[in-house]
Amino acid sequence: MVTLDVRPQLLDALSALRDRVAAVRLPLPLPGAPRARQTRSELLAQLDDYLVPRLRAPEAPVLAVIGGSTGAGKSTLVNSLVGRQVSEAGVLRPTTRTPVLVCHPDDHHWYAGMRVLPDLMRVWLPHGEEELLSGTARDRDRGHGATGAPDPTRELRIETVSTLPRGLALLDAPDIDSLVVENRTLAAELICAADIWVMVTTASRYADAIPWHLLRTAKEYDATLVTVLDRVPHQLLAEVSRQYAALLTRAGLGDVPRFTVPELPESAGGGGLLPASAVAPLYAWLAHRAQDPAARQQAVGRTAVGVLESLSRRMPELASAVAAQHAAAVRLTTAVEEAYLREGKRVRARLQAGAVLAGDALTRWRGYPLDTTADELLDSLAESLTALLQCAVAAADERIAEAWRREPAAGAVPLPTPDPEAGERIGIAVRRWRRVVEELAEEEVGHMEKQSAPAADAVAALLVAALLGGKRARQAGDRLAQRIGVHAAVRLRDRGNELVTSHLDKVLRTERDRRLAPLDALEVTPEPQAELIAALSVLQKER
């Protein structure tokens, strides 16, 4: 017999593990990421809706979730098990939009609150009442689960019937293959909340892929499972049952209890109740699991232990997916950093070669001071430096885009494209740098005797030409020394070089950081991987 040793330390470890799973982010579209996101959702659903609530309240009723494909007759089966219509059934698809939980009146308190399925708003329907609760009563049944207030767009309708034994609750879930995505998602969440998985299929669909995926998942978790082969024509009953049993055996599920419900007039359209005799074996099996202590312990304990043991495999898989996300984010980040680092080196090399002193700037320099004023020379040098930086940023962005196109993960962030505002930002930064250099020249001239002091704008023009002209403007340094003295010129050029370096680095760093901002906003960090493994390690020690 499977037994559970429920200690506070185990619950604390599970809660910590749950928080670590919730903190996982998988935003990058890597191969395997959709599966990892599904694993994360399933883990949260099982921890929030099943494992933690079950371990905290071992005495709570056994919850059997009725799941299956479209048209399998789940709602009709639930209605027939309880002896009256509690769940909407019919030929229109999808039928079960709002899941319905049915329990004995004495057990209603277990589900009126948010002990399980905390994200679903309760809609309480006492026995015999035909209308939904008023808004005021509905508000009273709202609670707060692990994720906060329940979603008002997702409801769990609760019915009580005295025909169900105490200690047993049935939950009619939406179709697992519903065309409505929200229904499929909800069906998966509800199944994760089950002590007993009741898989319903039909004679015409028992070999379909989706029901078998559910069966294999139950086997993977070692959950307590029962299958119902529904709506089987009488003339095919023996043959279909034999074939279905053979399929289960080949899948390693030969020991799973199987129940067969024949095709009956009441099955047509899903509007009637099946005779009690048609569902009596299943009813008796479920009731035994609720009322017999040993059978109950076996059913509940097997599912809980199965989920616990599955964490040893699923958590490392999730941690591996987190690591892959971080590795991809590092590759994307490195491509940006390397592109801008390369262009930064290229800009400095171009400055030393005198690339700024070209075109209009070179013409102005050659005409200075006879045909060109200091302001005109400064304007042309600033414009040339701005153009050099704009070309560097554009080249870096092209290199980044080329590298990112080879990365599947780059699909989560926009590829760098020409930014019409980048030129304006760079121009503003260069003008600010120019103003700082002008202030530097003014300060130096201010320390000189007024009679011999040159004009500050002339000093600034020669200084900028010397800083940006490279080999082509060697005369600028000599002329600057003639104007203010050798020592002052050296001191001024040293301070000016520091300003050039810092401002160029700042411009490129600003543009680089703007390219990294969308990636940084995804918050793909390495910490969650280590935290997942650490939380699993603590849990394993507490088991």
Named regions from a protein language model:
Residues 1-84, 169-170, 187-188, 192-196, ...:
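Non-catalytic alpha-helical scaffolds
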Residues 59-296:
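Globular "head" domains of long coiled-coil molecular machines
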